[in-house]
A protein has these predicted regions:
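Sec/Tat signal peptide C-region and signal peptidase I cleavage site
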Residues: 18-23
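A surface/secretory-pathway sequence property marking extracellular, secreted
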Residues: 60-87, 143-149
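Bacterial N-terminal signal peptides
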Residues: 9-17
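Bacterial N-terminal signal peptides that target proteins for export
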Residues: 1-10
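Low-complexity, serine/threonine/proline/glycine-rich extracellular segments that form mucin-like
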Residues: 30-68
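Low-complexity, intrinsically disordered segments enriched in Ser/Thr together with acidic residues
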Residues: 94-114
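Short, solvent-exposed loop/turn segments enriched in Ser/Thr/Gly
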Residues: 35-40, 101-102, 115-118
Length: 152
């Protein structure tokens, strides 16, 4: 009986861990060629019991985002720096509880191999927010993409 309880507790912990790991904003693909063009997809889940209505993104330095995939019912407000480069965006719409959406972006990667970090804040209709800006392994990690060197 004790063995069964330990197994049940271990299984419950594993399910909770997997569930929480999937609740994060993600960027796909997680690997891309340095200097290459890429279609990035931001996957946004809503595991709260209230609507999520805004996602604010800050793009990695050196990444040149140049187009956004339209999403029915959502608007995209683009933020630019002094040079006119797109440095972030705000998506506004309705993401109902326990649903997810994917938002596409076209970009040119920085030339240098290494990691680039995206930062997102997800806002909810009850006034709360989740900031996906933490280090890997934190409760709310920022999505990271590894840029691989290309041999030419």
């Amino acid at each position: 009986m004790v063995k069964l309880s330990i197994r049940a507790a271990a299984l419950a912990a594993l399910v909770a861990l997997i569930g929480s790991a999937q609740a994060h904003i993600r960027i796909n693909p997680t690997e891309s060629p340095a200097g290459g063009r890429e279609m990035y997809r931001m996957r946004v889940p809503n595991e709260k019991q209230v609507n999520s209505s805004r996602i604010v993104g800050e793009f990695p330095a050196g990444l040149k985002v140049y187009a956004f995939e339209p999403k029915a019912g959502w608007t995209v407000d683009i933020r630019r720096n002094d040079k006119g480069d797109i440095v972030g965006a705000t998506w506004n719409g309705v993401l109902k509880p326990y649903e997810f959406l994917e938002f596409g972006m076209l970009a040119i990667n920085p030339e240098a191999a290494g990691e680039i970090t995206w930062k997102f804040v997800q806002y909810y209709d009850d006034g709360t927010k989740e900031e996906f800006v933490g280090a890997a392994g934190s409760r709310l990690p920022a999505p990271v993409v590894t840029l691989k060197a290309v041999t030419r």
